[in-house]
Amino acid sequence: MKKLYLASKNQGKIEEYKKLLLNVNCQLLLQPESIEVEENGITFRENAIKKASEVSKKTRNYAIADDSGICIDALDGRPGIYSSRYAENDQKRIERVLHELDGEKNRGAFFIANVCVCSPSRDVILESEAKCFGNIILSPRGKGGFGYDPIFEERSTRLTFAEMNNVIKDSCSHRGRALKKIIPGLLEIFS
């Protein structure tokens, strides 16, 4: 079975990927701990390509990466590409966003995900982008998910990502939508 390395050290992310790529005949693995990739691109796309390219080079295998984040209208798109570095942990990131939006009526936001797959030769062979629109609520709701999931209410369901079951989240999340776009290509590669 061919290996596909997820260019991430985030255990929550690999669990999400395993569910979404269930029908792809590959062994999905987290990147080795020894690999460090600096996310210094100025776009989500640049960061996704850089991560997949570096991990494919160092593992000599296929690699998949995404760069994703939340962009909040009233904060001029922040945290944006700095979403995972906006504070030291999920709880503090949520607290910071809620503090910065205190008293703000415009709470519109969107999650964005850029997904990239690189071949063992580091060539970009698949990529996609998807967004999910919603609002930042006043206080966290729900027990599931990770990151900003408890404060992001998806527009069509009126549920936070933390309140959604996997089926609902996979169908409407930014990452789920971006991955679905490249699944036909992955099925071909890993057939």
Swiss-Prot record:
GO-annotated cellular components: cytosol
Catalytic activity: XTP + H2O = XMP + diphosphate + H(+); dITP + H2O = dIMP + diphosphate + H(+); ITP + H2O = IMP + diphosphate + H(+)
Free-text comment on the cofactor: Binds 1 Mg(2+) ion per subunit.
Keywords: Hydrolase, Magnesium, Metal-binding, Nucleotide metabolism, Nucleotide-binding
Cofactor: Mg(2+)
Binding site for substrate: S8, K9, N10, Q11, G12, K13, S68, F146, G147, Y148, D149, K169, H174, R175
Molecular function terms, GO-annotated: dITP diphosphatase activity; ITP diphosphatase activity; metal ion binding; nucleotide binding; ribonucleoside triphosphate phosphatase activity; XTP diphosphatase activity
Binding of Mg(2+), residues: E38, D67
EC number from the UniProt entry: 3.6.1.66
Superkingdom of this protein's organism: Bacteria
Active site positions, chain numbering: D67
GO biological process: nucleotide metabolic process; purine nucleoside triphosphate catabolic process
Function: Pyrophosphatase that catalyzes the hydrolysis of nucleoside triphosphates to their monophosphate derivatives, with a high preference for the non-canonical purine nucleotides XTP (xanthosine triphosphate), dITP (deoxyinosine triphosphate) and ITP. Seems to function as a house-cleaning enzyme that removes non-canonical purine nucleotides from the nucleotide pool, thus preventing their incorporation into DNA/RNA and avoiding chromosomal lesions.
Self-association state and partner proteins as the record states: Homodimer.
Family per similarity comment: Belongs to the HAM1 NTPase family.
Protein name, as recorded: dITP/XTP pyrophosphatase
Lineage, highest ranks first: Bacteria, Bacillati, Cyanobacteriota, Cyanophyceae, Synechococcales
